Amino acid sequence: MRIHYLLFTLLFLFLVPVPGHGGIINTLQKYYCRVRGGRCAVLSCLPKEEQIGKCSTRGRKCCRRKK
């Protein structure tokens, strides 16, 4: 039973995001952007694209072609 407590603690520590980094959150946002048919743009979307969300907590935009 003691090993369960240790494993749970280690899992919890790996899943808690570090302030300012947000590794797991950024990964989920990128995945969600691709599921919606978008791409992650560094600065801004291209002229024929629209912003449909964010890819990271640092300001990358999720863009897809206008319909």
Swiss-Prot record:
Pfam families: Defensin_beta (PF00711)
Signal peptide: 1-22
Subcellular location: Secreted
A single MF term (Gene Ontology): chemoattractant activity
Main localisation: secreted
Keyword Disulfide bond: yes
Residues annotated as transmembrane: none
Swiss-Prot/TrEMBL keywords: Antibiotic, Antimicrobial, Defensin, Disulfide bond, Secreted, Signal
GTP-binding listed as a keyword: no
Biological processes annotated in GO: cell chemotaxis; defense response to bacterium
Annotated Gene Ontology cellular component terms: extracellular space
Annotated S-S bridges: C33-C62, C40-C55, C45-C63
Protein task: Exhibits antimicrobial activity against Gram-positive and Gram-negative bacteria.
Family per record: Belongs to the beta-defensin family.
Name recorded for this polypeptide: Beta-defensin 103A
Annotated source species: Gorilla gorilla gorilla
Lineage summary: Eukaryota, Metazoa, Chordata, Craniata, Vertebrata
Gene: DEFB103A
